[in-house]
Design a protein with these regions (language model features):
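C-terminal motif of bacterial Sec signal peptides marking the signal peptidase cleavage site
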Residues: 18-20
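Pro/Thr/Ser/Gly-rich low-complexity, intrinsically disordered linker/stalk tracts
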Residues: 23-62, 94, 112-121
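Solvent-exposed loop/turn segments flanking beta-strands in beta-repeat/beta-sandwich domains
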Residues: 58-73
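Short beta-strand segments within Ig-like beta-sandwich modules, predominantly Fibronectin type-III
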Residues: 77-84
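Beta-propeller and closely related beta-sheet repeat lectin domains
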Residues: 142-145, 208, 212-224, 280-283, ...
Length: 418
């Protein structure tokens, strides 16, 4: 069974997420009509998979009743009155040429047609610019997990983040970097959460007993809501070697926040004890009687990485104490009995990924972990534990030849599905 996915997907972009996503492109293209002079000047802009087309009639001698707008990909047909000067096309394919035709219609017959060739990038610039503004909230960061809250808000869990303003696509090199922040999204408005313990230079969450976040810190995993509690998996990281790639994983903590105030109630270490290559909490799914907690496993972590996915299940009441691990055929309380999930071997799953339910299927979304591949894939299953099938390349990040652009760990946000 194949799906056409239309939820928001946000890849992490370095060095500046806001700079990459906040400018809406407007283009002018020459029109072609049977070697004659064009009868209209056409411009367009795009957001996500929507194309806003506008035009100005340059030949007012033509007699017609209406405009007809079509394209050669989606097979949409729109008809608007002769006094209209714009229209909106949706579900337009991105990162490939699309021919859009503007026709003049008189008495049901087409009298003239102009063709405009467009290519859109598929980026949801409106949501991105709202989520990551140039000032007033988090202005850059990675991670970008999101969790819908019961009152309609969403909380975004960010990793390394900046709060300082961005001017003309640049930020001061002196800006303080937070190891994690939260963004509270409420009907198009955003606010940043940081400063744990009243220290404005502290991240939103800090491991208990830690005073120097340059040596030990939290990077976010995923989370879920149960009742009036928000559960967030935070991975405990430490600087184990010199250089920007010297970070190491230690374990994962579960942070419990009271809703709707987001007051931190308790911090508890996950019950899993095992290899530091197994990172539980990288995806989470609250589904019926069970909470499913997914782990990304580094088999090799180099230029040609190999990674696997494991899953444990528990109940909200036993989240901090008792887990069962999927063995490939059933569930066991022995963590060493866990087996990798079937069907994912063709794509190295990224360090952070998503599993969510969409209608009657489960969806796993990941970005290819190979360095700067730019490929985002989905797999579907009838069960939270797989087997995973229907591999789909749903998006390829454009401009990957730009060596200053580094993308990783794409995230899905199904609560914003159109």
């Amino acid at each position: 069974m194949k799906f056409r996915f239309r939820y928001a997907v946000l890849p992490c972009l370095l060095p500046a997420f806001a700079a990459a996503c906040s400018t809406e492109a407007t283009h002018r293209r020459p029109n072609i009509f049977d070697d004659e002079e064009s009868f209209a000047a056409v411009t367009f802009s795009s957001n996500a998979d929507s194309l806003f087309l506008s035009w100005e009639l340059t030949d007012d001698r033509i007699q017609f009743d209406s405009y007809r707008i079509t394209d050669n990909k989606s097979q949409q047909v729109l008809t608007v009155g002769r006094d209209e000067t714009s229209c909106l096309l949706t579900h337009v394919p991105y990162n490939e040429p699309v021919a859009v035709y503007l026709s003049l219609v008189a008495g049901g017959e087409v009298v003239k047609t102009a063709k405009t060739d467009v290519v859109i990038d598929g980026l949801d610039k409106t949501t991105a610019a709202t989520l990551i503004p140039d000032r007033g909230s988090v202005t850059g960061g990675d991670g970008t997990y999101s969790i819908p809250l019961p009152d309609g808000r969403s909380i975004f869990l960010m990793g390394d983040s900046y709060i300082g303003p961005v001017t003309n696509g640049q930020r001061p090199t002196s800006d303080h970097m937070f190891r994690n922040t939260y963004i509270l999204y409420d009907e198009g408005r955003v606010s940043a959460i940081y400063g744990a313990g009243g220290d404005r230079n502290a991240s939103a969450a800090v491991p208990p007993g830690v005073s120097d976040e340059s040596r030990k810190w939290y990077w976010p995993g995923h989370g879920f809501v149960e009742g009036n509690t928000l559960y967030v998996f935070q991975t405990v990281m430490y600087q184990g070697a010199e250089g920007m790639w010297g970070f190491r994983y230690e374990t994962t903590d579960i942070l419990e926040y009271e809703l709707p105030s987001l007051t931190l109630r308790r911090t508890t270490r996950i019950p899993f004890r095992g290899s530091e290559d197994i990172h539980y909490g990288m995806a989470a799914l609250n589904d019926g009687d069970y909470v499913y907690v997914y782990a990304q496993v580094d088999v090799t972590n180099d230029a040609d990485p190999i990674s696997e996915v494991l899953v444990a299940r528990t109940t909200p009441a036993k989240l901090c104490t008792d887990w069962e691990y999927y063995t490939g055929s059933g569930w066991s309380t022995d963590p060493s009995a866990a087996e990798r999930l079937e069907g994912l071997a063709s794509v190295p799953v990224s360090s952070q990924f998503n599993v969510f339910r969409l209608r009657d299927k489960y969806v796993l979304l990941t970005q290819n972990k190979r360095y700067n591949s730019g490929e985002i894939y989905t797999f579907t299953s009838d069960s939270p534990a797989g087997p995973w099938r229907n591999k789909q390349l749903i998006y390829r990040i454009p401009a990957m030849e730009n060596r200053k652009l580094f993308t990783y760990n794409a995230m899905a946000h199904p609560q914003f599905e159109k």
